[in-house]
Amino acid sequence: MAMALMTPSALQAEDALPGDGTLRFYRLAIPVTVSAFENDLQGDYGLFDDDYQDKVIPFWQACEDFVNEVFVPLGMCFDVVMDKRLVMTEHINALDKSEELPEIGNCTNYINDAIGEGSYDVGMWVTHRETYAENSGLSVEGGAYINSAKGSGYAKTDKWVVAHELGHMFGAPHTTTGEGSLMDSGGDDFFAYPSIKTIRNKAKGTSSYKNVKVDNNAPKFNAEAMQKTYRIPQGACLSIDVQATDAEGHRLLYTAIGCSSANVDNIVEGGSMPHFASFVPQESNVITYQPTYIADIMYDDYFYLKDGTDVPNMEPGNYALSILVNDVPSTAWSYSELQATPFYSTYAIWESQVQIVGGTAFNAKLAPAKNQYTAGEQVTVSWGVNENYFTADSRLRISLSTDYGKTFSATNKIGIKN
């Protein structure tokens, strides 16, 4: 959750990716309230020195590692301030509210009083939140760039929520509900394109604890191997073979995001447009929008849908699709590694369109049905044919999966008349 504080320094810049080639280092303060120390970290003030070393420090380190994992591709690196004074020994009534909304107006002042204004660059409190509380965190959108609000945020004692709220602090709103990315409720560990663009735009030209200019060429698409329009029949899945290279031979990550607008940038907080869920950036260059099924370990013959996509359920029409490729460091994405070998991730973006042709959906059916089938019995497969997409010369290939849709290695028939 974020609240906007409208000041001139919080206005969104208009520059697009890849940014300004500057790796920014920040000192991140994560103050711990009494409720977080006792309830979440299971700390005992009677054993404070031991629990500080055994419980607080490991939590801070886990936060640092995770925050860097998701922010380094944006050109930001964080060093968590390991200072015992950031563990509160007295209740701060405005923050130790496990059910109600904590008050963030004085959060920055509390940190300044504890360790000094010049000892950190951005702060994020952690405090205990009940599961039924109204939210898991709140912060000032763009607060990292406002001196009086640079510590005005809180999160429940969870590294993912800390990173999410920091996304707000560096200017990103929520993406449309349904996304799997860090700035939505999906729970995956990455920023989607709209968030990346917003955060990098706002960071451009700003100072940090340490700015390091890095020369790095962006990856390039093989335009001859890419398409501007990907045409599929209604109800179908979508697979795109992305062809890109990097001049320095860096490791590449691939992702994509699409929506019903003419511009993916319109996927922001409050939007309700149908859209394709963002991919977790992957090393495979094949972007595939298809359901994946996972076998349930507790019940035989039962599976559930994981990382489902709305593409097969999309209405006919044209959808914007942005395909992103970025290079990443081959070493660990830690503060110490990037201090020694600075790296600034660069992006190539392929803007395209997905055209979903309306008509009869494929919808394969089996006879007899699964619950009526006996081993060895012949099975008849039937399917719908979209005559607006397929022609009389179209042929069908039937591939089967034995691992719940992860791979389709068994091909029964090739060239069946549709």
Q: Whereabouts are the PLM-identified features?
A:
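Fold-level signature of zinc-dependent metallopeptidase catalytic domains
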Residues: 14-132, 136-139
